[in-house]
Regions:
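Short, conserved SAM-binding/catalytic segment
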Residues: 1-2, 235, 254-269
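Conserved phosphoryl-transfer catalytic core
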Residues: 51-58, 259-273
């Protein structure tokens, strides 16, 4: 299997090929599609997304929350087949106003029905909260979660780059925390929003890579979208593999990678914390 490539296909097909080719990855870093019911996916929702009709250009949603939960379990079973020993899954999953508890049910199902458990939960504070919640009793969500999932048998051995200097009694300054501040996304353009209205930023991915990746690691994004994970990996010195069902998003991602669009300064790996 070719690395440093985004495959225009369903992620389950990509992972089946990984297994057949004995291709493994060190990190899985992704944000799955929202659980938008199929009958609502093509409806205009002006209160939440001004000038945008849908989240994605191709994907039309899931049949039901119950289906989404089962799909999540199958996804993590597939992850188990391609993730290296002591590897990590960095799963950016937030909750919605319509179904605020679904994300937690999905993670609970993963713990119950797969080999994975939650090792950490990172809070990502965005620079703005969009869409703003106009519900009478709900908060506007400026933070999202990144669930750090590892195999239960590897809970004490999974890999990070984290170095703690001193000990808990006399040195707190160099301790890595579960809090990240990073922009929502790289760009706010009509072109990208029509393709994918739920992207994250290269700065966000870079913060995660600083904690869990070394150069030459291979990172897999099962929902690559417009290529943000690939761009961040390229800058960081990691290899990447991506899956994306939207041909238009793959083409846009390849354009970003070839032209260096929306990239960032390569980090100093020696000064992580």
């Amino acid at each position: 299997m070719e690395i440093n490539k985004i495959y225009n296909e369903d992620c389950f097909d990509t992972m089946k090929r990984m297994v057949s080719d004995n291709q493994t990855v060190d990190i899985i870093l992704t944000s799955p599609p929202y659980c938008t019911p199929k009958d609502d996916a093509r409806k205009n929702t002006p209160k939440r997304f001004k000038n945008h009709d849908v989240f994605y250009d191709v994907f039309e949603g899931f049949e039901s929350p119950e289906f989404y939960r089962k799909w999540t379990v199958e996804l993590f079973k597939a992850y188990d087949d391609v993730l290296e020993k002591d590897g990590v899954v960095l799963y950016n999953l937030s909750y919605s106003t319509e179904n605020p508890y679904l994300a937690y049910l999905c993670i609970a199902d993963v713990i119950k029905y797969t080999n994975f458990v939650v090792a950490d939960c990172i809070s990502w504070k965005k620079n703005s909260a969009l869409p703003q919640n106009r519900n009478s009793n709900r908060l506007t969500r400026v933070c999202e979660f990144v669930f750090v999932l590892v195999r239960e048998l590897e809970l004490k051995t999974f890999r990070t780059t984290k170095e703690q200097y001193g000990n808990m009694q006399n040195n707190y300054t160099n301790l890595a925390t579960n809090f990240i501040e990073a922009p929502n996304n790289d760009i706010l353009s009509t072109e990208v929003n029509k393709l994918n209205n739920a992207t994250f930023s290269t700065a966000f991915v870079n913060e995660l890579l600083k904690i869990y990746a070394y150069p030459n690691y291979t990172v897999y994004d099962s929902f690559m979208g417009t290529g943000t994970t690939a761009v961040a990996c390229k800058n960081y010195g990691c290899n990447y593999i991506g899956s994306e069902i939207s041909k238009a998003q793959v083409e846009f991602a390849n354009k970003r990678l070839s032209e260096g669009l929306y990239s960032m300064k390569k980090p100093d790996i020696k000064c992580l914390f």
